[in-house]
A protein has these predicted regions:
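Aromatic-lined ligand-binding clefts that engage carbohydrates, nucleic acids, or primary amines
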Residues: 57-80, 116-118
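Hydrophobic alpha-helical transmembrane segments of multi-pass membrane proteins
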Residues: 154-172, 179-199
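Sequence/structural signature of beta-propeller blade repeats across diverse families
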Residues: 20, 36-46, 86-96, 101, ...
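Beta-strand-rich ligand-recognition modules
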Residues: 80-115, 120-131
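Extracellular and analogous surface-interaction loops
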Residues: 52-65, 105-112
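Extended carbohydrate-recognition surfaces in non-catalytic/accessory domains of CAZymes
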Residues: 1-61
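Short, aromatic-rich amphipathic segments at membrane interfaces
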Residues: 130-153
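Alpha-helical transmembrane segments of multi-pass integral membrane proteins
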Residues: 124-138, 192-199
Length: 199
């Protein structure tokens, strides 16, 4: 999705049906929308926790397109033209942070040439309106991309588990009471949990 991208900062008023009026305004691209250089963050004032981003999906023939992207500390809704097709989290303050999350959003095969709009919310101004990465491709290509990005984690996990088991057997067999071995085993255990969480 290499553009052009437009943004609009703030909370959208509702129309007569209760839907955000800026969804339809994104389709017609009225005067309230401003161009920005994607993938950079839009130049926001920081006065509102909401931003709207919109672009047109490239006009291609798709079979089973999937939009893959990652976000950090943001909740959002995604609209295809004027229809909401995906939502993540609540667009209100939450007790706990959303952290970093990746999303695989299936799109209809006829999505080429249609407008894609994001309504984004965050209490972290430096994160609002920013994607860590984004790609639109066929489903098999997206799964291949995801596996390639996770190969370092997938290979490190079994090695880490084997090292933990070898060290545990060594300590139990020799009845070693040195705290250093306990700390090293704890490191391997926590590192394994981290690897599972990031993959």
């Amino acid at each position: 999705l290499d553009g052009p991208w437009y943004y609009r900062e703030g909370f959208s008023p509702a129309n007569v049906t209760g839907a955000p009026s800026w969804v339809r305004a994104a389709v017609t691209l009225d005067a309230g929308w401003q161009l920005f250089n994607y993938p950079d963050q839009p130049p926001l004032t920081g006065k509102a926790p909401f931003v709207w981003l919109t672009t047109v999906i490239p006009a291609k023939n798709y079979q089973s397109p999937i939009l893959f992207f990652t976000t950090t500390e943001q909740s959002f809704r995604v609209y295809l033209d004027t229809t909401m097709i995906y939502r993540y989290g609540s667009l209100t303050p939450q007790r706990f942070s959303y952290g970093s999350a990746w999303h695989m959003l299936p799109l209809p095969s006829w999505c080429g040439g249609h407008r894609l709009t994001f309504e984004m919310y965050s209490t972290y101004p430096h994160r609002l309106g920013q994607f860590d990465r984004m790609a639109l491709d066929e489903s098999d290509a997206q799964l291949t991309r995801l596996l390639k990005e996770d190969i370092p984690y997938l290979t490190a996990l079994p090695v880490n588990i084997v090292m933990f088991i070898f060290l545990l057997v060594y300590v139990l067999k020799r009845r070693i009471r040195d705290r250093l071995y306990v700390f090293v085993m704890l490191f391997f255990l926590l590192f394994s949990v981290w690897l599972v969480g990031t993959s």
